[in-house]
Amino acid sequence: MAKVEQNEGLVEKLVAVDRVAKVVKGGRIFSFTALTVVGDGNGRVGFGRGKAREVPAAISKALEAARRNMITVDLAGTTLQHPVNARHGASRVYMQPASEGTGVIAGGAMRAVLEAAGVHNVLAKCYGSTNAANVVNATFKGLRDMTSPEKVAAKRGKSVEEIQG
């Protein structure tokens, strides 16, 4: 489902295109919304939504929004730092680090975000609503909340060995 393009060293993925309708006195006015994910494959990732009367315009607006809304994710090599739970609306996501060679085991919208971020080994599951926009939002919340042991140790004023036990 995700369409992939390379541009400026960024991986651009089209996650979803939906037709929406505005009902007016004279009938319905149709337009399109696009959801895209952009990442450098090295810990920077962003998502955006665009809306226009035609699909290509909606996609270009969404890609522009995604480039503006990029975040940096602390990765542990090619996987996550620790297991993460997050939710947005009725969508709940669970992501956990996986050993080398596992691959990205995740569903549609989550897979696009994780691959764009540069995660190569992860186990992920989506619960509740599988609405693409909510799943992408929940995945971003989880990735944003993830912290490295070094940051936790610095915040607590302890060594990394004390934190990890």
UniProtKB/Swiss-Prot annotation:
GO terms for biological process: translation. GO terms for cellular component: small ribosomal subunit. The keyword 4Fe-4S does not apply. GO terms for molecular function: rRNA binding; structural constituent of ribosome. InterPro entries: Ribosomal_Su5_D2-typ_SF, Ribosomal_uS5, Ribosomal_uS5_bac-type, Ribosomal_uS5_C, Ribosomal_uS5_N, Ribosomal_uS5_N_CS, Ribsml_uS5_D2-typ_fold_subgr. Residues 10-73 form the S5 DRBM domain. Keywords: Ribonucleoprotein, Ribosomal protein, RNA-binding, rRNA-binding. Pfam families: Ribosomal_S5, Ribosomal_S5_C. Part of the 30S ribosomal subunit. Contacts proteins S4 and S8. Belongs to the universal ribosomal protein uS5 family. With S4 and S12 plays an important role in translational accuracy. Located at the back of the 30S subunit body where it stabilizes the conformation of the head with respect to the body. The N-terminal domain interacts with the head of the 30S subunit; the C-terminal domain interacts with the body and contacts protein S4. The interaction surface between S4 and S5 is involved in control of translational fidelity. This is Small ribosomal subunit protein uS5. It comes from Acinetobacter baumannii (strain AB0057).
